[in-house]
């Protein structure tokens, strides 16, 4: 989506999002942990900003809504993912965690419906990881997506823009925009509870409190509908649905053409072979014609014979 103000006005709620999963995109990962932290626009606008060096980490808003869930995946976590997140498929299952299912989608919908609208999801590296993965998980389900009508932005793009605006010349070095690197650059300390969904969401919130007014303006201009996000990879349900629809349309079209009703063009109906001819019984008129001709011939012969007998010399 281009840089333009949304027609419905300002985003009223920012929902900071983080997912933990079984691995990298190439491994077709599944979600193992999810955290959403909903903050009203007013709470961000009223963030108290200190100019100290180093600046203190801003306190999170007092009024927030939070949803944090651990989720049992359908596949094993990669060793690297388990080491970083501290989660494994076996441990999640033994503690009775449930799959990413329709009930979770209903829970997400209820959470979002409680927030002032419009809402915008904010995730770090969201465009490349969190949003496509979340879209993939939702595509597996039979229920409609709870995120229809919700917007989203990637905080990496936002923070790059804010940093470049604050120091256009830069320092000539290439900066890292990982969540931990930005946090350390701003507040001169490492974030706590990294690679837990809730810990990363709180870290992201603290970063976005650095320049809240500029951030909100950027979000208003760059938010895009979550429905435009493409899934990270195809799922059996999604693939089956996608493949079946064209086949169904193709099958219906020739059937409708072959069976064309009177309201449709009759000229398109296949021509049927002409019916076999059945010998017809001779009609009465057909019999009278030869009989009349025979009678005339008989009379003519009798007349000629009578004239012959009556001629002289016979």
Swiss-Prot record:
This is Three-prime repair exonuclease 1. Widely expressed with high expression levels detected in spleen, thymus and uterus. It is found in: Nucleus; Cytoplasm, Cytosol; Endoplasmic reticulum membrane. Its cofactor is Mg(2+). Homodimer. Interacts (via proline-rich region) with TCERG1/CA150 (via the second WW domain). Component of the SET complex, composed of at least ANP32A, APEX1, HMGB2, NME1, SET and TREX1. Within this complex, directly interacts with SET; this interaction does not result in TREX1 inhibition. Also interacts with NME1, but only following translocation to the nucleus. Directly interacts with UBQLN1 (via ubiquitin-like domain); the interaction may control TREX1 subcellular location. It comes from Mus musculus. Ubiquitinated, but not targeted to proteasomal degradation. Ubiquitination may be important for interaction with UBQLN1. The keyword Magnesium applies. The gene is Trex1. Optimum pH is 7.5-8.0. Gene3D superfamilies: Ribonuclease H-like superfamily/Ribonuclease H (3.30.420.10). The active site is at residue 195. Disruption phenotype: Mutant animals exhibit a dramatically reduced survival after weaning, with 50% of survival at 9 weeks or 17 weeks. In 6-8 week old animals, multiple organs show extensive inflammation. The most severe diffuse lymphocytic infiltration occurs in the heart, followed by the lung, the liver, the smooth muscle of the uterus and the salivary gland with periductal infiltration. Other tissues exhibit only minimal to mild lymphocytic infiltration. The heart phenotype includes inflammatory myocarditis leading to progressive, often dilated, cardiomyopathy and circulatory failure. It comes from the Eukaryota.
């Amino acid at each position: 989506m281009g840089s333009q103000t949304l027609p419905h006005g300002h985003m009223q709620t920012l929902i900071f999002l983080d997912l933990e999963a079984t691995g990298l995109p190439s491994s077709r990962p599944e979600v193992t942990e999810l955290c959403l932290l909903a903050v009203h626009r007013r709470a961000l606008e009223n963030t108290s900003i200190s100019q100290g060096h180093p600046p203190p980490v801003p306190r999170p808003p007092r009024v927030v809504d939070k949803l944090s869930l651990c989720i049992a995946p359908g596949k094993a976590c990669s060793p690297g993912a388990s080491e970083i997140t501290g989660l494994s498929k076996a441990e999640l299952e033994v503690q009775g965690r449930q799959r990413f299912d329709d009930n979770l989608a209903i829970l997400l919908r209820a959470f979002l419906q409680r927030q002032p609208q419009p809402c915008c999801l904010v995730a770090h590296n969201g465009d490349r990881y969190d949003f496509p993965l979340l879209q993939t998980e939702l595509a597996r389900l039979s229920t409609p997506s709870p995120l229809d009508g919700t917007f989203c932005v990637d905080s990496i793009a936002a923070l790059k823009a804010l940093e470049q605006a604050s120091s256009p010349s830069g320092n000539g070095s290439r900066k890292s925009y990982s969540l931990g690197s930005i946090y350390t650059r701003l507040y001169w300390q490492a974030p706590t509870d990294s690679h837990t969904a809730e810990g990363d969401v709180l870290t992201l919130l603290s970063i976005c409190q650095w320049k809240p007014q500029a951030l909100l303006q950027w979000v208003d201009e760059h938010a895009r509908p979550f429905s435009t996000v493409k899934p990270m990879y195809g799922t059996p349900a999604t693939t089956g649905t996608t493949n079946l629809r064209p086949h169904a349309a193709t099958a219906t079209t020739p059937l409708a053409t072959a069976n064309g009703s009177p309201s449709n063009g009759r000229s398109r109906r296949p021509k049927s072979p002409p019916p076999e001819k059945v010998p017809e019984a001779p009609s009465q008129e057909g019999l009278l014609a030869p009989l009349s001709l025979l009678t005339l011939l008989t009379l003519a012969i009798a007349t000629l014979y009578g004239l012959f007998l009556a001629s002289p010399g016979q």
